[in-house]
Amino acid sequence: MTTAHAAAPADAAPSASAARTQVARIALVGDRSPHVKSHARIPLLLDALASRDGLVLDAYWIPTSDAAAEAAAGTLARFDAVWVLPGSPYASEAGALAAIRVAREEGIPFLGTCGGFQHTLLEYARTVCGLAGVAHAENDPGAPDLLIAPLACSLVGHEGVVRAEPGSLAETALGAERSTEHYHCTYGPAPRHLPALTAHGLRLSGHDEEGQVRIAELPGHPFFLATLFQPELQGDGTRPHPIVRALAVAAVAHAAARAAGVAAE
């Protein structure tokens, strides 16, 4: 686990007026690489969140090869947010899934983008829906039952419109029902398994103009959102995407609530 950003000292008082200055710890789960554009954006986004919005995140990179052990040790559960980043195929599918499960079960604000979206659906299908045999084609191309399959048309370098369902977390986070987003992926969910996901409580709350799923969320969770597109690639990194900012807001709120709970003990 490596530090990605040194946060400035902040007042730890948990009151509503001080929540903005509460430092939140965020786990960046992924196999950090200088060749992955979204990874290079992270320091810029963290700086912009702190300077523009007063949202201070103390970020730590956790390689997927370490994530399962960090989850088992309870380390991940002590973070205020978990972001499973692009960069698949991951070194450890199990590690990525373990990080997602901890965030989902522990009520920790969560964002999964691109590969993080794909593995969010995979974790939910296996753990919640009981579809233990479903696979990701990038990790296991010969598997007989693919939940995540090659897209008919690659979305590498693609930009397209996404529509969020009214009243969804996706719409709230985006601040609009319609948004133009950036992609860099070649895999997406197989339609035949989507009914099982929704039957077990996952909400598929954003679609492209052809009706293909692009956003998933979990009702009842404080903040659990996954997008096939990469919000971190919007602009030049100096103005965080609304979804990235929404994650930061949720993380700071989680940190403030945790601090209040500790103070009350």
Language-model-detected regions and their locations in the chain:
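An anion-binding catalytic pocket shared by soluble metabolic enzymes
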Residues: Y183
